[in-house]
């Protein structure tokens, strides 16, 4: 089976998901697709191009909604699609947040364009659209990385677990609000939290337009 850029990027994404970006190398990707490292340069220019390509792959997993739908529905569909794709590949979110990668492909740009189109259709100016777009990305990145951190097994060792410390310190007399809300904080759901934020954002955009 002949090698192409898509197969290289798919292999790189699987490797990054399994081992993290720090472990991603041209040599390891080459081994994953069964070729010598030099053969990869027929399909990707360098590691930066590789990172951009696998990031674009994640954006391309998102379906672009019908532009005839109301803008609120389009924003929600795109945001939920991006959340689901990012949650499958949180390693890419880390690369985006660190500005180590950019989604460089026509398919990825169509997703971004569709989101901006929906925001413009909300009646926002170009400047407000840019702010809303950045706000949504910040929500996406934060929610996905928070969820991913919750699943990490290896954490810094402490004499007292963080949860136990908060419960011990948050007494009704000293920290009454923290004491009251702490059980809800400890039982949070990242997906529900993201939907809550998204509802606030869409509601706020509707009021601002």
Feature map (PLM): residue ranges:
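Amphipathic alpha-helical interaction segments
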Residues: 7, 49, 77, 110, ...
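Helix-turn-helix
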Residues: 7, 11-49, 53
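Amphipathic alpha-helical packing segments from all-alpha helical-bundle domains
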Residues: 97-123, 127-134, 145, 167-176
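Short, basic, alpha-helical segments at the C-terminal edge of helix-turn-helix-like DNA-binding modules
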Residues: 55-61
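Hydrophobic, amphipathic alpha-helical faces that serve as interaction scaffolds
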Residues: 91-92, 141, 145
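Hydrophobic alpha-helical connector segments
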Residues: 63-110, 126, 133
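C-terminal peripheral helix-coil segments that are non-catalytic and often amphipathic
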Residues: 121, 149-209
């Amino acid at each position: 089976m002949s090698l192409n850029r898509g197969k290289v990027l798919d292999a790189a994404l699987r490797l990054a998901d399994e081992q993290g970006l720090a472990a991603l190398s041209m040599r390891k990707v080459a081994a994953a697709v069964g070729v010598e490292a030099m053969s990869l340069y027929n399909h990707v220019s360098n590691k930066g191009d590789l990172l951009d390509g696998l990031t674009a792959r994640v954006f391309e997993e998102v379906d672009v909604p019908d532009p005839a739908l109301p803008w609120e529905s389009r924003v929600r569909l795109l945001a939920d699609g991006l959340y689901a794709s990012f949650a499958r590949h949180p390693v890419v979110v880390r690369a985006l947040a660190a500005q180590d990668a950019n989604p460089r492909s026509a398919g990825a740009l169509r997703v971004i364009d569709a989101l901006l189109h929906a925001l413009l259709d909300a009646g926002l100016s170009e400047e407000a659209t840019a702010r809303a777009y950045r706000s949504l990305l910040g929500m996406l990145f934060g929610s996905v990385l928070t969820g991913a951190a919750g699943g990490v097994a290896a954490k810094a060792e402490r004499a007292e677990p963080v949860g136990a410390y908060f419960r011990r310190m948050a007494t009704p007399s000293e920290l009454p609000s923290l004491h009251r809300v702490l059980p809800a904080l400890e039982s949070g759901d990242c997906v529900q939290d993201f939907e809550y934020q998204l509802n606030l954002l869409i509601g706020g955009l509707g009021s601002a337009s």
